[in-house]
């Protein structure tokens, strides 16, 4: 018997109970995603407490930098991991390892390139991202430091997807968790103890990212399960095409998020100036809500990422019943989590906003109203990102891209531009639930159609 086929037949991805298998992969993935979200949220909380509203506004202006870097990391990390699992499921171990090697090297190259571009064009980029004159000094201090850590951030985020694909979800979780703990310890020390202000928050983040990246490198040099030699680390165009094909959905989704952030910041700057709130209050408040929403999305995307090796392997092995069952379990989990977050957003908006520092009555009035209205359809908002991951993991790149684009680009982006023309700054709030409803309906339609095909196969 071919050893690859024998290994394939014994692989727990194809034979273990779906519930326990999904928990094994999803829980570490959720923790890793939450930790990645906390890199931003912990900074925002300490900066909000130590610097104030302008610090919150500055981190919101800087957020597209992190989002764009995440796009590169997910493009290569998820694309590499999805291809790796599909090839392993088909018994092509050598090709799978070559794909992983190409992804790892390209992650480093891309991270360095993004950092260089941001540092070279820092001021015009911050203006483009929506910075006001008041916020600009804070944003410049923050982003000029954050950019230094982007190569490490990109390797850490993308590399952890490959570590999970290599059947080491716990190590992947440990990589991100260690960096986040270091970041959390250093934030108050640098911001309050050393009185570095917003620069302290940035340096704490960078140091945490460096530690996470070092742990990723240690895994692939000492603890990996896959076969990987130096020759496989040279990027091959044929593999990069396959990687970008399956990673494009996740990458485009992040780019779409960045585009919405940039457009929204500029809309808030323009319409905020004509409102009672001014420009800086809406920019700061929307940044806080975006960070809070990251926690919810981190859990749903973590469930999807935990399911992806199961979906990919079993689809490659033509075990379609297991693919369908995994989708049902994942969708149920996402819906339960989404409902819990919906209740928190509606019942405790003041407490949630208050974690990120104090402000005027106008500040809290806008923040609480925005959180309640913009996140009104949270209970239905977990299916769309999960479905994008589903289609990507089974090799349906086009459907994955469509799912990734629905909420951010197809629905939310136009609504964010159109609604304020008639409703002023309040129009931004109402764009959220309408976009969520449309994206949810589309995701359900596409997913049911694809799962129906598998049932009849």
For the regions a protein language model found, what residue spans apply to each?
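Short alpha-helical transmembrane segments in multi-pass integral membrane proteins
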Residues: 1-26, 84-151, 195-248, 311-376, ...
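Residue-level signal for short hydrophobic patches within transmembrane helices
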Residues: 19-38, 42, 65-72, 148, ...
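Transmembrane helical elements of multi-pass membrane transporters/channels
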Residues: 24-43, 145, 179, 208-212, ...
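Transmembrane alpha-helix boundary and packing residues in multipass membrane permease domains
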Residues: 29, 33, 45, 82, ...
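Helix-terminus/linker motif at the lipid-water interface of multi-pass membrane proteins
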Residues: 34, 38-57, 126-133, 189-196, ...
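Small-residue-rich hydrophobic transmembrane alpha-helices
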Residues: 56-116, 153-172, 265, 283-343, ...
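Short runs within selected transmembrane alpha-helices of multi-pass transporters and secretion channels
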Residues: 77, 146-164, 172-183, 201-214, ...
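Transmembrane alpha-helical segments of integral membrane proteins
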Residues: 411-420
């Amino acid at each position: 018997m071919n050893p690859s086929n024998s290994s394939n037949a014994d692989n727990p991805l194809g034979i273990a109970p779906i519930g326990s298998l999904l928990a094994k992969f999803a829980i570490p993935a959720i923790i890793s995603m939450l930790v990645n979200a906390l890199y931003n949220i912990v900074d925002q909380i300490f900066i909000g407490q130590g610097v104030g509203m302008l610090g919150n506004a500055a981190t919101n202006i800087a957020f597209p930098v992190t989002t764009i870097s995440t796009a590169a990391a997910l493009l290569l990390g998820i694309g590499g991991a999805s291809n790796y699992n599909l090839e392993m499921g088909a018994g092509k171990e050598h090709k799978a390892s070559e794909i992983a090697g190409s992804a790892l090297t390209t992650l480093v190259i891309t991270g360095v390139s993004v950092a260089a571009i941001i540092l070279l064009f820092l001021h015009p980029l911050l203006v483009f991202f929506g910075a006001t004159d008041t916020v600009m000094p804070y944003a410049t201090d923050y982003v000029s430091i954050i950019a230094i850590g982007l190569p490490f951030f990109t390797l850490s985020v993308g590399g952890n997807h490959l570590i999970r694909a290599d059947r080491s979800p716990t190590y992947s979780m440990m990589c991100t968790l260690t960096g986040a703990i270091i970041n959390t310890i250093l934030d108050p020390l640098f911001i309050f103890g050393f009185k570095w202000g917003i620069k302290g928050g940035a340096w704490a983040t960078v140091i945490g990212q460096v530690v996470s990246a070092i742990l990723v490198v240690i895994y692939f040099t000492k603890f990996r399960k896959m076969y990987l030699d130096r020759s496989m680390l040279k990027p091959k165009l044929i593999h990069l095409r396959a990687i970008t094909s399956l990673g494009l959905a996740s990458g485009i989704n992040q780019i779409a998020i960045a585009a919405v952030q940039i457009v929204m910041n500029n809309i808030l700057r323009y319409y905020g100036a004509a409102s009672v709130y001014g420009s800086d209050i809406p920019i700061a408040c929307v940044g806080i809500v975006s960070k809070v929403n990251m926690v919810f999305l981190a859990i749903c995307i973590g469930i999807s990422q935990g399911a992806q090796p199961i979906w990919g392997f079993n689809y490659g092995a033509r075990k379609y019943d297991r693919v369908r069952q995994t989708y049902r379990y994942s969708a149920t989990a996402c819906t339960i989590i989404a409902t819990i977050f919906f209740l928190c957003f509606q019942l405790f908006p003041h407490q949630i906003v208050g974690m990120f520092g104090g402000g005027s009555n106008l500040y809290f009035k806008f923040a609480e109203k925005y959180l309640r209205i913009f996140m009104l359809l949270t209970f239905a908002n977990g299916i769309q990102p999960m479905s994008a991951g589903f289609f990507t993991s089974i090799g349906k790149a086009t459907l994955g891209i469509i799912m990734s684009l629905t909420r951010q680009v197809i629905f939310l982006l136009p609504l964010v531009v159109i609604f304020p023309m008639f409703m002023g700054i309040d129009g931004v709030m109402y764009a959220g639930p309408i976009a969520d409803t449309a994206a949810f309906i589309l995701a359900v339609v596409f997913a049911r159609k694809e799962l129906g095909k598998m049932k009849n196969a």
